[in-house]
């Protein structure tokens, strides 16, 4: 798993290559299932405060507990499965999801991205179970799955936004030019400001 950030210009190039069959069309981009494309506020707001100490301590306790888990072996596998109720919810989500990604409406690059969610959704539910309900004898309940599905709903909007960077004609340059003209920062060939 990777966490981090990237500048929009860099990701635009990667997405264009992935969508247009260039060097970036190697499946790597589709593996960033937790990719988000947040809005940038135009007004800067300084936030300088002490971290929430109890929340920080609770998070570290989870990290320490997860770090103490014994890894599975061939002789002693650790199996987690959905409860019957969670399995029913998963199928209720999966069937229309699979139908949707097999349709004609979505770009193939976005379909490749979303197809990875067959694994991502159960993986998120497992993470939530390991964090919040680790003593359930390897059973992932509907609460953890519903949270994973809520994440999927949120992540889908960001995936669509990510791929739209290459699928919708680029207008960033036009917006920048218009801002300079409106701001009185653009001159003609004789040095006269445009209005």
Provide a role label for each language-model segment.
Residues 1-195:
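Phosphate-handling catalytic cores of nucleic-acid transaction enzymes
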């Amino acid at each position: 798993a990777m966490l981090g950030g990237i500048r929009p210009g860099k990701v635009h190039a990667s997405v264009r290559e992935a969508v247009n069959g260039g060097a970036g069309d190697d499946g790597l981009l589709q593996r960033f299932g937790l990719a988000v494309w947040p809005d940038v506020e135009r007004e800067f707001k300084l936030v300088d405060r002490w971290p929430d100490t109890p929340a920080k301590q609770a998070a570290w306790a989870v990290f320490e507990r997860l770090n103490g888990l014994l890894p599975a072996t061939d002789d002693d596998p650790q199996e987690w499965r959905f409860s019957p109720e969670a399995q029913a919810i998963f199928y209720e989500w999966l069937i229309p999801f699979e139908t949707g990604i097999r349709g004609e409406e979505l770009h193939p690059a976005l379909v490749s991205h979303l197809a990875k969610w067959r694994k991502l959704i159960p993986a998120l539910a497992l993470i939530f179970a390991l964090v919040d309900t680790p003593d359930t004898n390897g059973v992932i309940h509907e609460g953890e799955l519903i949270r994973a599905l809520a994440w999927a709903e949120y992540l889908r909007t960001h995936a669509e936004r990510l791929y739209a960077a290459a699928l919708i004609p680029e207008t960033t340059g036009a917006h920048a030019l218009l801002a300079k003209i409106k701001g009185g920062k653009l001159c003609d060939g004789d040095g006269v400001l445009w209005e």
